[in-house]
């Protein structure tokens, strides 16, 4: 399983990932310090069948059993890193995170004229 990430700078407001000595992801959180982070997550995930099942059970347990309905998906991801392997997938090239219409307009201006 993979988490797409960007190594081009620490962003305080973004989810960061930390890796172990083997390069596998061990933690994802906004609170990871700059001297401990490996990269910034861009919130794109590729899960193998094993990880998808484990994550599904973790989310079910969080919502249905623990009754915690206001947590990010990353909280569940962080809880399963000890149960399955995730590696960082470093993106390259230009990209821009779009969370709302204002971000979309800004991205359109930044990438205006780019050929795909």
Label each residue range with its predicted role.
Residues 38-116:
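Conserved alpha/beta core of the MobA/IspD/sugar-nucleotide pyrophosphorylase nucleotidyltransferase superfamily
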Residues 1-63:
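Conserved core of the sugar-phosphate nucleotidyltransferase
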């Amino acid at each position: 399983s993979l988490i797409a990430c960007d190594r081009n700078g620490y962003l305080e407001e973004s989810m960061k990932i930390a890796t172990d000595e083997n390069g596998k992801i061990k933690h994802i959180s906004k609170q990871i310090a700059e001297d401990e982070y490996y990269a910034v997550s861009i919130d794109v995930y590729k899960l193998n069948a094993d990880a998808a099942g484990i994550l599904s059970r973790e989310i079910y347990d969080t919502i249905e059993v623990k009754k915690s309905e206001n947590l990010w998906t990353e909280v569940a991801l962080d809880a399963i890193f000890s149960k399955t392997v995730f590696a960082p997938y470093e993106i390259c090239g230009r990209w821009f995170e779009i969370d709302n219409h204002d971000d979309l307009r800004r991205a359109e201006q930044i990438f205006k004229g780019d050929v795909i």
